């Protein structure tokens, strides 16, 4: 019985430590996103330009343009993401962009 209690306690501690680590990573990502918003406000890439795949679609100019990456682009060095025309959902999603004033009419 005591073995089961100890194993359960160790399992809880392990899960808790992973949760704390994930929370720290999330806080770091939020801090980076806050820094990136200033950059997004200043610039918007034209259609067809090379964009950064792990950032938001707000970096591409236009309501319907999004950063589109090829399949498994993270594992291929030569693969680059480009600003390409998306669907209507892209325009709805980009309403919350900080630099939307650049392309909205």
Swiss-Prot record:
Which GO cellular component terms, listed alphabetically, does the Swiss-Prot or TrEMBL entry include?
extracellular region
InterPro entries (UniProt xref): Toxin_34
- Indicate where this protein resides in the cell: Secreted
Describe, from its UniProt entry, the tissues in which this protein is expressed.
Expressed by the venom gland.
Which positions does the propeptide occupy? 18-41
* Source organism of this protein record: Lycosa singoriensis
One MF term from GO for this chain? potassium channel regulator activity
What keywords are assigned to this protein? Disulfide bond, Ion channel impairing toxin, Neurotoxin, Potassium channel impairing toxin, Secreted, Signal, Toxin, Voltage-gated potassium channel impairing toxin
UniProt name for this protein: U2-lycotoxin-Ls1e
Its function? Insecticidal to house crickets. It induces an excitatory slow-onset impact that leads to irreversible spastic paralysis. It also modifies human voltage-gated potassium channel Kv1.5/KCNA5. Most likely, it binds to the voltage-sensing domain of the channel, suggesting it does not block the pore but prevents its opening at physiological membrane potentials. The recombinant peptide binds to the channel in an irreversible manner and slows down the hKv1.5 current activation kinetics. It is not toxic to mice, when intracranially injected (at 0.5 ug/g mouse).
- Does the entry annotate any disulfide bonds, and if so which pairs? 51-67, 58-97, 60-83, 69-81
Q: Name one Pfam family in it.
A: Toxin_34
- Identify the stretch annotated as signal peptide in this record: 1-17
Family from the record: Belongs to the neurotoxin 04 (omega-agtx) family. 01 (type I omega-agtx) subfamily.
Q: What is the lineage of its organism?
A: Eukaryota, Metazoa, Ecdysozoa, Arthropoda, Chelicerata
